[in-house]
């Protein structure tokens, strides 16, 4: 009987059914990821569940694409799942580069909160697929919005990694030797061998996380730049103007300036230690305002037309 109910729910509303399933997978994965901080044998289970979550989100988005007939990133509900898909992908790629239980332990809570927000806080009418207005029926929708959402995912991962560096070193001075250019755990030694060969040195745990944070933010910055460029081209084609200072456009530009300043200080000024980690961590809130915060206004071309119904919750 229970199995029959699952089948009926899947057939009737596959998108919502898979969405709830993803929430429960994350709910299971959260305590396992915290346990893995003390018992590394649990890390393989965390990675397996994360892969399943990533695949289920892909299945959900493909299902919505088939049902709606357009790329499934046209409303807040769809974009939240796409964002978590990007974060889980980033989590898996970063873990492949440097395996540590800290990475899923900091990423999974954000993934769970995001999916919980999409499942249980958003109004039901915002979860439904709707027909696109003529201006959005463009191949630029796929290119622009997906690139911007992936940039958010990369920037969020970078901020979370920097936060983990600060947390690990909260009671001691933070001295990092990691290279801003991200040389993958190698650094030019001050001493040379008899054969004039530059020898690699091992980075500490915090230095590895700091380097990964820098790399993630660099990827996110490049994607955000591409997102702004494609958005400007699309806006000119659709509305005849490259830039309209829409609230979302303005905050996307502020985010771009913020991370440009961070990268400039890391590369040109050689920033090391606590200051760049604090700046990168605060970038999480910049992205949060850019992505979610402007929707409080309920205005602009990029708004989903929804103001947080907090007064309806009481």
Swiss-Prot record:
One GO BP: cytochrome complex assembly
Residue ranges of the TM segments: 15-35, 48-68, 73-93, 102-122, 148-168, 216-236, 250-267, 277-297
Keywords (A to Z) from UniProt: Cytochrome c-type biogenesis, Membrane, Thylakoid, Transmembrane, Transmembrane helix
GO molecular function (one): heme binding
Membrane topology classification: Multi-pass membrane protein
Any one Gene Ontology cellular component term annotated for this protein: plasma membrane-derived thylakoid membrane
Record localization: Cellular thylakoid membrane
Pfam family membership, one: Cytochrom_C_asm
HAMAP family: CytC_CcsA
Family: Belongs to the CcmF/CycK/Ccl1/NrfE/CcsA family.
Role: Required during biogenesis of c-type cytochromes (cytochrome c6 and cytochrome f) at the step of heme attachment.
Subunit structure: May interact with ccs1.
Record's protein name: Cytochrome c biogenesis protein CcsA
Species for this entry: Prochlorococcus marinus subsp. pastoris (strain CCMP1986 / NIES-2087 / MED4)
Gene name per UniProt: ccsA
């Amino acid at each position: 009987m229970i199995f029959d109910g699952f089948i009926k729910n899947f057939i009737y509303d596959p998108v919502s059914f898979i969405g709830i399933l993803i929430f429960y997978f994350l709910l299971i994965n959260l305590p396992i990821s915290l346990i893995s901080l003390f018992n590394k044998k649990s890390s393989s289970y965390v990675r397996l569940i994360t892969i399943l979550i990533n695949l289920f989100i892909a299945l959900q988005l493909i299902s919505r694409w088939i049902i709606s007939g357009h790329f499934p990133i046209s409303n807040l509900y769809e974009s939240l799942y796409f964002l978590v898909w990007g974060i889980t992908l980033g989590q898996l790629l970063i873990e492949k580069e440097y395996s540590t239980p800290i990475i899923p332990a900091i990423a999974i809570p954000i993934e769970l909160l995001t999916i919980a927000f999409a499942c249980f806080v958003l109004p039901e009418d915002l979860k439904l697929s709707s027909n696109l207005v003529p201006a959005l029926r463009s191949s630029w929708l796929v290119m622009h919005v997906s690139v911007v959402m992936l940039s958010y995912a990369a920037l969020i991962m970078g901020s979370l990694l920097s936060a983990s560096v600060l947390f690990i070193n909260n009671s001691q001075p933070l001295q990092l030797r990691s290279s801003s250019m991200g040389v993958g755990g190698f650094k030019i030694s001050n001493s040379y061998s008899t054969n004039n060969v530059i020898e690699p040195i091992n980075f500490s745990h915090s230095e590895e996380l700091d380097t990964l944070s820098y790399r993630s933010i660099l990827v996110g910055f490049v994607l955000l730049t591409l997102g702004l460029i494609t958005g400007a081209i699309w806006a000119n084609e659709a509305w005849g103007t490259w830039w309209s200072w829409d609230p979302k456009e303005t905050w996307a530009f502020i985010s771009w300036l913020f991370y440009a300043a961070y990268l400039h200080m890391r590369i040109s000024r050689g920033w090391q230690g606590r200051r760049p980690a604090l700046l990168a961590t605060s970038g999480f809130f910049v992205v949060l305002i850019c992505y979610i915060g402007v929707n409080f206004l309920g205005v602009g071309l990029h708004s989903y037309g929804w103001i947080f119904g907090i007064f309806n919750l009481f």
